[in-house]
Regions:
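Basic nucleic-acid-binding alpha-helical/helix-turn surface characteristic of O6-alkylguanine DNA
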Residues: 1-156, 204-208
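Short glycine/serine-rich loop segments
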Residues: 156-200
């Protein structure tokens, strides 16, 4: 009977350890770190509320920095899906009621702009810069995607501008509906019923 090849077996084990200690182990270590950080981070605090609007049910949410989300014409569960599942939700708070009160005034024609702290920190720097420019468009006016790109010093970026506006988490308050295509067509709109909602808002403001 042959003796076991101990030296050869040890070499195989050493080689396997070498393979496992490479990229695979690094990925696993990074994943464990992310999971630990996720559980260590305090669950976000979010206040949310809803109201009936001419565009359907409207939902608003506030975090510690300010208004962070508005959606309308959809179901509440779809609205809540955008938040961290660990979020601590509080409904119908005073902070949310202030937002809803201003929105009611807007829909009734008593208000054309908003005085609210907002939080768009989850967006990229480019997306935030696009929304900052959109906030400069006065009620009753419309700008084109091209003009916003030019205002940013990137005249060829009209398509990325449209993509950034589509990710606006706070429609109406940040008036992405005031941006249209260069040919005069409305272009897209991520809020509510899409272009129909955009058309309704522009008519409310006297732009159409």
């Amino acid at each position: 009977m042959k003796k076991p090849r101990v030296k050869d077996d040890r070499m195989i084990v050493t080689q396997l350890r070498s393979v496992l200690s490479g990229p695979t182990e690094t990925v696993l270590a990074r994943s464990r770190t992310r999971v630990r950080k996720w559980f260590a981070t305090e669950a976000p605090w979010i206040q949310c509320g809803e109201m009936n609007s001419p565009l359907g049910p409207l939902f608003a949410a506030v975090n510690e920095r300010g208004l962070c989300a508005i959606d309308f014409g959809r179901q509440q569960n779809k609205f809540l899906e955008r938040f961290d599942p660990r979020a601590r939700l509080e409904k119908n708070s005073q902070a949310v009621e202030r937002i809803l009160a201003q929105l009611r005034e807007y829909f009734s024609g008593e208000r054309s702009s908003f005085n609210l702290p907002v939080d768009i920190s989850q967006l990229t720097p480019f997306q935030r810069s696009v929304l900052d420019v959109a906030c400069r468009i006065a009620p009753g006016q419309v700008w084109t995607y091209q003009r916003i790109a030019e205002e940013l010093g990137r005249p060829r970026a009209s398509r990325p501008v449209g993509g950034a506006l589509a990710r606006n988490p706070i429609p109406i308050v940040i008036p992405c509906h005031r941006v249209i295509a260069s040919d005069g067509s409305l272009g897209g709109y991520s809020g509510g019923s899409g272009p129909k909602a955009k058309q309704w808002l522009l008519r409310l403001e006297g732009a159409l």
